[in-house]
Amino acid sequence: MTNETLQTIRSRRSCRAYEPRQITDAELDAVLEAGTYAASAMGRQSAKIVVVQDAATRAQLTRMNAAVMGTDSDPMYGAPTILVVLADAHANCAVQDGSLVMGNLMLAAASLGLGSCWINRAREEFDSAEGKALLKKWGIEGDWIGVGHCILGYPATAPKPAAPRKPDYIVRV
């Protein structure tokens, strides 16, 4: 059985090479809206999405993330847009709620022909003094957990086909 949604799920791949041009506002808005419709525990919508497209903030996040990773390379792979997903630290299912947002963002991006990738280390970034200062600068108050970065852009290369699924992925009892 298949439909457009299932086909997008099957074909989405992490993109690690991007064209330098910025995505359109319409594409960004569509991806963001999809993120806001992610399931959340008790419908509380505990996540928050921060859009980063300016060069200075993008460079700061890249530097912070690379430091946590212990590398000099660009962990954001040159993507022109970074969506930082945060979750309310006091919510019962904060990380799960934020993770569902990340999934919706990436699937929506794929449905529009955009590349995306989940970049880790957001928790370490926003646990740091520099990360907390960024949140304050952005007007975000309270206790927040960095769930992930969803990087977005136009893929520089076509995605490779999916690897076969492992035979023991599903266990029916």
List the predicted regions and their residue ranges.
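Acidic, surface-exposed loops and disordered segments
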Residues: M1-V173
